[in-house]
């Protein structure tokens, strides 16, 4: 065990591994991304559309004839006008002005004019990585999407094909497909299959010789079977017997030639066109050429037929016919259509990351291309990389992709398709006997061969024939199988961070504004008379970008329940959203944990509902590279020795490396101790020699998110319970008295530090002044001497603390100093705690003395029995701040007035209002002052419509003036069920906030702080997914008590542990008690937690010292103790596990959920009461509740529930009148839902009529 510093506290850590890498800034990803957008991305977008010509529509014009050109040279970001706190208070957007230097050029004269123009205000990120939009703090969530690139997918196997596709950032997919049935290559254009060679002719490979040369294969000149099998193939080189040429390039390999080659010793291999490429070429001839080779089938060919017979024009027209069969094929239209589809930068964008991925995927194919096609030396070729940089597709991209398909065909064939094994064995035998040994084959014509087999041997599957041929032709080759690309691999996924998301939006909108700028350019006559600012009016763009922050699915109202929920929200990664997956998607693979997520995305933290697996969290050490790929760090291992060199790897880069966990035993010099160690290799776990290890994890916390790494003994918890634990920590309410956990993980300090709510010292210094709202530190230099400026004044840092600020979820944000005057502080030390922090550490809950035992059924179904002591000591008391708002508007009948002069209101309700009618700060307000009277927060009256005034009213008006006017009381009142203290009042008029809203004269906001103590029905939880509801609050003298008389504070159900498999809570309970007894604070890092014997033995010794060991076994300590019943003093039958567990109070507070409905709103169609507190709704009586009432025979109750209490409109009105007049309630009528049913049936053309018991027709509309 070692001591570690956590904030201003020291913990005893059970961690044994050395961590060479400090935990990075956990909000850095958000900050860096948005800073890059403002500094570079904005200019990138503007330059992408520069220059804008006034005559841009005519591409054939010379530059000098293009009129005027506008281009953007640079951008500048101004300073924020209003600070974040003022923006939140006034409901403004925290933003900065952006300027661009634009240059206008007269293309004819060359004259230029440069000017800095104002583009508008754009939201600015706060220091904590958030945005303030219209006064609300928001976060833009990172989005994970499939990266643009080239993918060879197993999905094609379902269609019995091999294929890959180019996935662009913008534009159509281009597929490359190999159909193994007819051995032909196809290009998939716009969803239609076209012969690949036809397509290659349209993109630069005009001659057939050029195309066929791209697809060579080599035959072993000594392999008789292989040579004879490929009779009919096209030669790609001259063949010599000594000095005598016996065959030319482009000749056909005949049977005689093959036999002759076998007898020549000097020839090692011959180069031919790959059979599939030859087949594709012949298919192309059949498609386009009208003439054929009828009658020549039996004659052996010696020369290639139809070379260059298909022209480029033929290719264009044939493709256009395929793609647009409804249009008349024209060569210009065909060229334009194909060019726009894949080669026009305005329509097709592979993006930089897409180009990088394509280059990476084609690297090996390019090396083979250089060796086989270009004839380069293999050693030299392997040094080269495929370094294309075009953002549209290039012909060679498509060629290399199609060549890769041959590898899939040759190496995977038998495995990928279901072939009858008996039939296959039989075929191989026949093939060897009948064709190879008797030399019957004349050419590699798959179609003929298949038809012969079908006719002669009754073969049912074409694939069996092809598999047999493939088996024979590769009988001596050991070819490893090639894996397919998977979309779920993180090497094929990238993260769009906030900067990129905003930049994409900006780019999309600027494309629209470009036309407006162009139109204004056409109106210019001379440079001297024009202002560039008048040309550029892109305020609509800026306002729409602002709308992105307010409305986009990825811009979310920040989860601000506690510092952890805020930190997690900023590190969230979503697969849903624009351009991502849909929440309704049934693709389970996309939700599953993938091995490539190790160290990049947390395998634990994800929501439980429809978003499970789609929304995840970044792991602690994750970084995002310039392309958006997730990287994780590893320590380099050389010859079995672990070095301190840290390397960041992408998911696809680590595939072939052997990586061992951080817990692998090493000696003091870093040498791995065991000779064989467990290592990860791709998705496998293997036992490998230590010399073969390449990397080691940097930390045991590496795979997990911040939230998951805060769970002690995580390794002892089932994954689904750990998921609940990490999610529920984010719902913990900051308590009045924060207390850090006795048993932590060491991450509490890191989480609090990165949340932005713990104030850190910016420089070394000595604390000069401290009060509740500010801290002043006198700086010191590196020698500890106080610093003064040139005038002899002390150099000080002043820190302003947040006091009683309302969070997005109505919890309280409050900072308090944790240093005293005269304290020395170092740079980075915590000097003030925020909400839910204690001495710089995250403190979401309280350490509670718990006992695991049943108690009178009060802990049935995970319910929790708590002691009155927790209420008396304010252990789970929290403060919630709610804001109430009202506006005084200009109405048709005159202005509304905020006043204390409210008609027909008692003095009791007005006593806390000031002379302006606004509640005074510090007043304690209760929602109910007697029956039906709610506390008034803001007095407001609205003019009433006045009819003809009587003479008496005229006299009153003349005497009392406006006060005699008829007004309606529209005061802002405190809602039912709320009480608290007014802590702040904000009053704004149009002088304070320019955009107050049309017709709004004054805005008043009243902040009320409520104290919420623990109550029955409140939800409590531990950190291990162990959650429950308070069932009863017992006097502390009735609670079970320890041998020394200490009553336990909480009783939990022991049945909640075995089936849930979250044993971590038991270990935490034991270690928590040890911490309490010894006064130490422990840290048990993830996967390095304390072992049982490290806890139970010292715990027994400490308990024995204090006489608390009764019920435990000295030889085999179990941590149990004999408890006595507080009511009787009798001991319970069995010893009980007792200890300190860290418990959280969750934001689901019962008092906030309970409400009562009198008469409220009804839904429009069904006329049934709405549901939920926000709609003042009723309790739903569902189908099963109806069964229950039926089972009891409660006919009258049931009739009442289904009619007058629900949707019998006439009946409920009559019942209301009857109650008011103290009369009997009338008989119920017809429910509205019955009428809706009748209407629906009539809508289906069914004539529904109703009859009474006498057979008389009933008119339902009368009831």
Swiss-Prot record:
A Pfam family of the record is RNA_pol_Rpb2_3
According to its UniProt record, this protein's enzyme class is: transferase
Q: Which CDD domains match?
A: RNA_pol_B_RPB2
Q: Which UniProt keywords apply?
A: DNA-directed RNA polymerase, Nucleotidyltransferase, Transcription, Transferase
- Tell me, what is an example of a GO biological process annotation in this record? DNA-templated transcription
Membership in a protein family: Belongs to the RNA polymerase beta chain family.
User: Per its database record, what is this protein's job?
Assistant: DNA-dependent RNA polymerase catalyzes the transcription of DNA into RNA using the four ribonucleoside triphosphates as substrates.
Which PANTHER family does the UniProt record give? DNA-DIRECTED RNA POLYMERASE I SUBUNIT 2
Q: Supply the name of the protein.
A: DNA-directed RNA polymerase subunit beta
Q: Which organism is it from?
A: Thermotoga petrophila (strain ATCC BAA-488 / DSM 13995 / JCM 10881 / RKU-1)
